C-alpha cells in the first residue's frame, strides 16, 4: 500500500506507532498534506523523547509539560546558510516576519496532534491508558451558563494549549499591488496573480486547476476546494483571462492541452506541472524587488477585502466565493484595515496641529465648557432661582 510519508528513527527504522496512525489518517480521507503536517509535529515530539530517553508509550504528563516548555523557548531549525528571520514588522507591508521561535498557532496545532495521537492508540489498545496531554478539568460542563441570545465563545479545553491570538488578515493596497504586479516577469505569473486576486481562491486550489477548468466565455474557472474537496466555479476578472490567453499562446505546442492536463506549467524544459513551492518562489522574487514580504495567501485576503467593501455585493455572496463554512469568518473582512486606521489617526493629528480641530483644553479664565448652569445648581441644592 502507498504511504505518502514515513517517520524514521535515528537508526533509519520506521517508527511503527506513527506509521499506524498515519495509515488511519489516510483511511479516513485526510490528504497527504495533512499527513505531512501531523508527521512533522510527531517528529518534533519523538525527537524530544529520544533526547530525554523516554519511550513514547511511557511518556507522562511531566514529559508533556516539559515539551510544552521547551517548544516555547527553542529556536526553529533552519537550512544551512539561511539568514535568521526577525519577528519585526516589515517597513513596506507592516507584517512581522516568522521569527526564530515557534508561533502560538504552531504550538497549539502540535498539542492537538499529539493528544489525538495518544487518543488513537488508547482506543486501539496499543498505547498508554492515560493521555500525557490532558484536557482542562472543570467542575461544570462547558457553556453551562451561556446566554442563548449570544454566540458561543471558544473555551480552552487542552491544558497545554497556548492562548489563541486572532491574526488580522493583511490586504495589499491597490498602489502596492500595481507595483508588485509590474515586477512579474511572465504572462503565466501575471495570469496566476490576476486569478488569485480576483477569485479569492487559495494558492493550492488554483494551482490544481486543469486545462478544461478555465471557461473564458462564462468568465469562470473551476477549482477543487481545500478540505471539503467540493468542485466550485469561481468568477474571475476579464484581465485574468487575457493574461491566461497570452500565456497559453506562448506555450502552444510545448505542453499538452487535453481537458484533464494541468493548466499551469513551468516555463523551462523539462515542462512539468507548476508546484506550490515554485509559485511561492515566483511571488517572493516579486516581493524582494520592493522589500516586501506579502504571501500568496495575502492575495486571497486582498480579494476578500475588495469584495466585502463593495456595497453592491452582499456578505453572503462573499462567503460563497471564498468558500467559508461560517459567515463569522467572512465578517473579519468588514473590520477596518490597520493601514487605514493609522492613516486616519495621522490625518487627525495633522488637523489638530493645523488648528482645524478644536483642542479640548480648559481655558484659564471663564467657566469650564463642561460646567453646569448656575440655575440648575441652585435648584439642585435648594437655594431657589436667582
What are the residue ranges of the model-derived segments?
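N-terminal core-binding DNA-recognition domain of tyrosine recombinases/integrases
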Residues: 18-34, 43-149, 179
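Flexible interdomain linker/hinge and immediately adjacent N-terminus
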Residues: 65, 127-179, 224-227, 265-271
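Basic, Lys/Arg- and aromatic-enriched nucleic-acid-binding interface segment
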Residues: 164-203, 207
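Active-site/catalytic core of tyrosine-dependent DNA strand-transfer enzymes
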Residues: 177, 237-292, 384-386
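Conserved tyrosine-mediated DNA breakage-rejoining catalytic core shared by Y-recombinases
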Residues: 199, 204, 208-242
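Catalytic-site neighborhood detector that most strongly recognizes the C-terminal catalytic loop/helix
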Residues: 225, 322-347
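Short, basic (Lys/Arg/His-rich) helix/loop patches that form interaction surfaces
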Residues: 280-320, 339
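C-terminal secondary-structure termini that scaffold catalytic or DNA-interacting sites
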Residues: 348-386
